[in-house]
Amino acid sequence: GDKVDLIIQNKSTHADKRTAEGTMAAFFSNHKVGSFNVNHQGKRDESGFVIGILMTANGNFRVNCFFRKVQNKYVIHQIRIDKTDE
């Protein structure tokens, strides 16, 4: 099946859907979400992106999420989460 690139605080993995969901669930269980603000977003032809700041109980993170179009729907291609002082 399709894989997604996850880069969470410099730890990178190329994961299938189930592994990616587990990795994201573990991150969010350790970082209770307060809010998420979108800073930039865009779409062009077969791809798109969202960049924002995730505010959690354990600090703020810059989130980059990249999409690509597959059979007329957008799927997540890459998620990058990095600690930030923003």
Task: Label every model-predicted segment.
Residues T13-A20:
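Solvent-exposed, acidic/flexible segments
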Residues N60-E86:
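Short beta-strand edge/turn micro-motifs at domain boundaries
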Residues A20-N60:
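Surface-exposed, charged secondary-structure patches
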Residues K3-T13:
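A short gly/proline-enriched turn/hairpin at secondary-structure junctions
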Residues D2-K3, V33:
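Short, well-ordered coil loops that connect the C-terminus of an alpha-helix to the N-terminus
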Residues I8, T56, V70:
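Acidic surface patches and DE-rich sequence motifs
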